[in-house]
């Protein structure tokens, strides 16, 4: 049974790969580059500072949800970028090292900020997930098991 399920998953994966291979890697990279270019233009007109990469992610999400961009148009390049994300953080790490004199001025404040922001992120994520589960947008397994036992 497990082997059949794994074979089914592999077959579905190859079907998905064939859909995304309909577009060349160049076309996929160009699609992502155009979205990033649009986000750079939007960034220049925004009254508040917001990174173009964040704007680009939101634009890509909206484009995927509305069907303007199909998943196959960005899937292969997106997967490659995600698989190599550690390599993409090297420039950011070098920037931090170049900013060490600034960071040395108030290390306790920076550590405190990191701890507080992490705790706030955990709390907000917990509340958001609880809200989603209680509103039945994403029902938990426990609720599914309870409802299946009631009827049978």
From Swiss-Prot:
<dbReference type="InterPro" id="IPR005538">
    <property type="entry name" value="LrgA/CidA"/>
</dbReference>
<comment type="function">
    <text>Inhibits the expression or activity of extracellular murein hydrolases by interacting, possibly with LrgB, with the holin-like proteins CidA and/or CidB. The LrgAB and CidAB proteins may affect the proton motive force of the membrane. May be involved in programmed cell death (PCD), possibly triggering PCD in response to antibiotics and environmental stresses.</text>
</comment>
<keyword id="KW-1003">Cell membrane</keyword>
<keyword id="KW-1133">Transmembrane helix</keyword>
<keyword id="KW-0472">Membrane</keyword>
<feature type="transmembrane region" description="Helical">
    <location>
        <begin position="108"/>
        <end position="128"/>
    </location>
</feature>
<dbReference type="GO" id="GO:0005886">
    <property type="term" value="C:plasma membrane"/>
</dbReference>
<comment type="similarity">
    <text>Belongs to the CidA/LrgA family. LrgA subfamily.</text>
</comment>
<feature type="transmembrane region" description="Helical">
    <location>
        <begin position="45"/>
        <end position="65"/>
    </location>
</feature>
<dbReference type="GO" id="GO:0019835">
    <property type="term" value="P:cytolysis"/>
</dbReference>
<dbReference type="Pfam" id="PF03788">
    <property type="entry name" value="LrgA"/>
</dbReference>
<feature type="transmembrane region" description="Helical">
    <location>
        <begin position="23"/>
        <end position="43"/>
    </location>
</feature>
<dbReference type="GO" id="GO:0012501">
    <property type="term" value="P:programmed cell death"/>
</dbReference>
<dbReference type="GO" id="GO:0031640">
    <property type="term" value="P:killing of cells of another organism"/>
</dbReference>
<dbReference type="InterPro" id="IPR023736">
    <property type="entry name" value="Antiholin-like_LrgA"/>
</dbReference>
<protein>
    <recommendedName>
        <fullName>Antiholin-like protein LrgA</fullName>
    </recommendedName>
</protein>
<feature type="transmembrane region" description="Helical">
    <location>
        <begin position="77"/>
        <end position="97"/>
    </location>
</feature>
<keyword id="KW-0812">Transmembrane</keyword>
<keyword id="KW-0204">Cytolysis</keyword>
């Amino acid at each position: 049974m497990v082997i059949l399920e794994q074979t089914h998953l592999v077959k579905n994966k190859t079907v998905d790969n064939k859909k995304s291979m309909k577009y060349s890697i160049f076309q996929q990279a160009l699609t992502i580059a155009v979205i990033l270019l649009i986000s750079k233009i939007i960034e220049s007109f925004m009254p508040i500072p917001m990174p173009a990469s964040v704007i680009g992610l939101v634009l890509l999400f909206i484009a995927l949800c509305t069907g303007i961009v199909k998943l196959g148009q960005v899937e292969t390049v997106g997967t490659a970028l995600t698989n190599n994300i550690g390599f993409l953080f090297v420039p950011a790490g070098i920037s931090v090292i170049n900013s060490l004199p600034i960071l040395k001025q108030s290390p306790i404040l920076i550590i405190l900020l990191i701890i507080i922001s992490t705790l706030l992120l955990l709390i907000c994520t917990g509340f958001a997930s609880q809200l989603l589960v209680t509103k039945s947008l994403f029902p938990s397994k426990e609720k599914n098991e309870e409802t299946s036992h009631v009827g049978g």
